[in-house]
Amino acid sequence: LLPLTQAKLPFVPLNDFAPVGQVSRLPYFLAVSATQPYKSAKDLLADPKARDGALAYASNGIGSMAHIGTEMLIQRAGAKMIHVPYNGFTPAIADLVTGRTVMVMADLAPLNAQLQDGKLRPLAVASEKRSPFLPDVPTLAEAGYPGTEFEVWLALYAPAKTPRAVVDKLSAELNKVLANPATREAFVRLGHEADYAAPDAVRKRIQAEQSAFAPAVRAAGLAAQTN
């Protein structure tokens, strides 16, 4: 997303780097305080208060994936909410629990303790499919908001001029490593899902996400200024 928010990057991602393969995905969940009445994403986003700017959502910082992804969801849901950025998820979730904000989009690691204690309620996962970490939580598409998927994902890259034969060999080895049960379990402990994707799929994903996120970046006032 950097090309969308920063005008003077010292590199052009898809020109200066060659994708080797996707490594893992980190799903994001929409969560609210358990004291809130909302039982689904639609309950929240269709609430009249969520449409007139009376509700606030938290993020771990301006320009973060949580910020931009939530703006995309709100925009496509026809809602209007106040953004309250925090310096990380820890204070954001603390205020969410106490009711200072109404929702947050975050990965499982900062949410897990409060979910286990029953202080937070997960309403949806922003991935294309349900997460094995919380399989009973529906996707945003299932909740009535298709096209709002987002997540943090990791990929391996090589310099742009790396011969394709070398890239393909590295990609094949990456696929083997990620298929190893021990490797997959190690990612689970980090809250990630090991999920290989080929170089061309990574390139297409970058292009698709830049197009999908551009309106949300503009709506959040984060679009790169060229002058």
Enumerate the language-model features and the residues they cover.
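Short secondary-structure boundary segments
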Residues: 34, 107-109, 127-128, 160
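Ligand-binding "clamshell"
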Residues: 3-18, 78-80, 114-125, 132-144, ...
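Short beta-strand and adjacent tight-turn residues that come in two discontinuous sequence segments
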Residues: 22, 86, 105-106, 125, ...
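Conserved functional loop/turn residues at catalytic and ligand-binding sites
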Residues: 40, 85, 99-100, 107, ...
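Short helices/loops that flank or line small-molecule/ion binding pockets
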Residues: 71-76, 90-104, 109-117, 206-209
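An extracytoplasmic/periplasmic, membrane-proximal ligand-sensing/linker region
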Residues: 75-76, 139-142, 164-227
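Paired acidic/hydrophobic, glycine-rich loop segments that form the ligand-binding mouth/hinge
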Residues: 56, 102-107, 122-124, 213-215
